């Protein structure tokens, strides 16, 4: 999994993720941007589920983060979209709406994101 942090001309940090992990970048950009306290909440939740079979969930404006001891899943809240109203032959594109990664990888992204924010 590859990622990149960018700062736009207004100073807003954007996270760009490799293919298959785009929803993680969207989560950082849409949910965390301007609310770094969310990262501490997620880290505390990871510590809280460690060694157990419990899960933890944080529902945001656009994305929901669900984690257990081993894996983090981020999905768009709109992913439950029903395609019944779509024309025949049309598909709902959701490749960028759902991503999975290991807890350790996710913690590494959080650490790198913080370091980027602090200019390290």
UniProtKB/Swiss-Prot annotation:
Disulphide bond pairs: none
Pfam family, one: UPF0231
InterPro entries, alphabetized: UPF0231
Similarity remark: Belongs to the UPF0231 family.
NCBIfam families per record: PRK05248.1-1 (NF003574), PRK05248.1-3 (NF003576)
Protein name: UPF0231 protein ETA_08290
Organism name: Erwinia tasmaniensis (strain DSM 17950 / CFBP 7177 / CIP 109463 / NCPPB 4357 / Et1/99)
């Amino acid at each position: 999994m590859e990622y990149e942090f960018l700062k736009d001309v207004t100073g807003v940090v954007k996270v760009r993720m490799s293919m298959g992990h785009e929803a993680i970048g969207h989560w950082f950009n849409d949910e965390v941007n301007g609310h770094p306290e969310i990262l501490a909440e997620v880290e505390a939740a990871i510590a809280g589920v460690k060694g157990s079979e419990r899960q933890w969930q944080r529902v945001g404006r656009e994305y929901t983060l669900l984690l257990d001891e081993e894996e983090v899943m981020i999905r768009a809240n709109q992913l439950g979209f029903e395609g019944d109203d779509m024309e025949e032959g049309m598909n709902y594109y959701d490749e960028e709406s759902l991503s999975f990664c290991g807890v350790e990888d996710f913690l590494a992204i959080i650490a790198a994101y913080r370091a980027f924010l602090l200019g390290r």
